């Protein structure tokens, strides 16, 4: 934790525990965030994590651990992958088009942290709202509601454009990088 060669942002997440492997690091961990390669996480590692762990296995096309294997390891695990065929698909398509649309709408000089945070907050708010029945039906379910299997909106949610892009545009205006101020509801 006190290492001089670790950036201050990373230092906050460092540990004083003597760990040298991923397996050791995951003991009691709340979150696994993987963007590496298939198979680096196994069921025993998931079982060693804290209660209700979040496993974000985002390697594509095959995640660090499959959704089914993670759920079989422990039913309380919350799993997100980059795959469309499982709950909680994490995909940059949820951000980039709407961040760019919001930036273009206000002729933003740059895309800053405030704009990215606005996009993240808009996605989080949308995930907590009631999902239209036709969208749920498109995924073969009667209902989608915020919880372990629905943390993030679906890529095909038609409400994304009307929520995320305006939030980004508003943040650009408020943070001073917008060159024009369109009507934002």
Name what the model sees in each region.
Residues 30, 53, 77:
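Conserved acidic residues
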